[in-house]
């Protein structure tokens, strides 16, 4: 027996064909699959910050150049003013500057009545007059208080800017005086359009405990007014506080002893009969 006598069927193998068309059918790859989005955002922020810093630096340089130019112009103007002054005026200015400097040094010993850099300084002026003038100028330099009108908010008034308990009490007393005057001028408008609603609005921000205190205070006022009204009513009606409102005074009773009168009359009649009448 030999291997040649055996028949073997060798399976045919099909060679896998590779073509460019198969490559075209592959899924498309991302162009930048390894790019980090956070890195891109960070670089973008850095670029924006850099541009902003460059812009700020450029703006600052421009401002510095502008200030330098203005300073040069100012220096040139002062220099021209000095050049135009004649020699006599120059000497006078130097003398005045020296006197001013000496007076300032001496004024340090007398309460700081300095005169430096004052073009209106008069060498012959008395120090007291100058102090009064400086005080008046300082007072005039203060900002004037705003003029209050009907449209001005109440907060502009100094009274409505309290900072401590004493100032709050001062505000309360001022308001009470003004409100009482309004109530006397127009009681109807005061009660219907101001008083009642004002009490409600003023009590709105208070706590529950404070609102109860307000109610207790109002109850005391109610009792006082009821008592005063009752006394006024009694006084008008001519009564007394214990007799009731409008009750007239009781008239004294006239005593008539009827039984005594009849007794007296009966006795008189019996006295008129004689003994002969019964005979």
Swiss-Prot record:
Keywords: Coiled coil, Cytoplasm, Initiation factor, Protein biosynthesis. It comes from the Eukaryota. One of its GO terms (molecular function) is translation initiation factor activity. Pfam families: eIF3_subunit. GO terms for cellular component: eukaryotic 43S preinitiation complex; eukaryotic 48S preinitiation complex; eukaryotic translation initiation factor 3 complex. Residues 20-39, 268-279 have a biased composition (Acidic residues). GO terms for biological process: formation of cytoplasmic translation initiation complex. Residues 34-74 form a coiled coil. It is found in: Cytoplasm. Residues 1-74, 229-279 are annotated as: Disordered. Residues 40-67 have a biased composition (Basic and acidic residues). Component of the eukaryotic translation initiation factor 3 (eIF-3) complex. Belongs to the eIF-3 subunit J family. Component of the eukaryotic translation initiation factor 3 (eIF-3) complex, which is involved in protein synthesis of a specialized repertoire of mRNAs and, together with other initiation factors, stimulates binding of mRNA and methionyl-tRNAi to the 40S ribosome. The eIF-3 complex specifically targets and initiates translation of a subset of mRNAs involved in cell proliferation. This is Eukaryotic translation initiation factor 3 subunit J. The lineage of its organism: Eukaryota, Fungi, Dikarya, Ascomycota, Saccharomycotina.
């Amino acid at each position: 027996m030999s291997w040649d006598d055996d028949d073997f069927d060798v399976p045919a193998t099909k060679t896998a064909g590779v073509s460019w068309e198969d490559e075209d059918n592959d899924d498309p790859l991302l162009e930048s699959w390894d790019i980090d989005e956070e890195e891109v955002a960070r670089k973008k922020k850095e670029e924006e910050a850099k541009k902003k810093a460059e812009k700020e630096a450029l703006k600052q340089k421009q401002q510095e150049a502008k200030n330098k130019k203005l300073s040069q112009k100012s220096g040139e103007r002062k220099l021209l003013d000095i050049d135009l002054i004649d020699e006599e005026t120059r000497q006078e200015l130097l003398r005045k500057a020296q006197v001013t400097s000496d007076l300032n040094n001496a004024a340090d010993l007398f309460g700081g009545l300095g005169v430096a850099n004052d073009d209106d300084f008069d060498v012959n002026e008395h120090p007291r007059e100058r102090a009064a003038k400086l005080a008046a100028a300082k007072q005039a330099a203060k900002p004037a208080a705003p003029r209050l009108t009907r449209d001005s908010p109440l907060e502009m008034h100094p009274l409505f800017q309290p900072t401590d308990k004493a100032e709050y009490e001062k505000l309360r007393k001022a308001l009470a005086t003004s409100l009482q005057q309004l109530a006397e001028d127009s009681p109807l408008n005061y009660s219907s359009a101001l008083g009642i609603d004002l009490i409600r609005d003023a009590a709105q921000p208070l706590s529950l405990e404070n609102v109860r205190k307000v109610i207790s205070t109002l109850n005391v006022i109610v009792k006082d007014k009821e008592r005063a009204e009752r006394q006024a009513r009694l006084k008008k009606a001519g009564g007394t506080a214990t007799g009731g409102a409008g009750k007239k005074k009781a008239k004294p009773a006239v005593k008539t002893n009827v039984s005594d009168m009849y007794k007296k009359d009966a006795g008189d009649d019996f006295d008129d009969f004689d003994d002969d009448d019964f005979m």
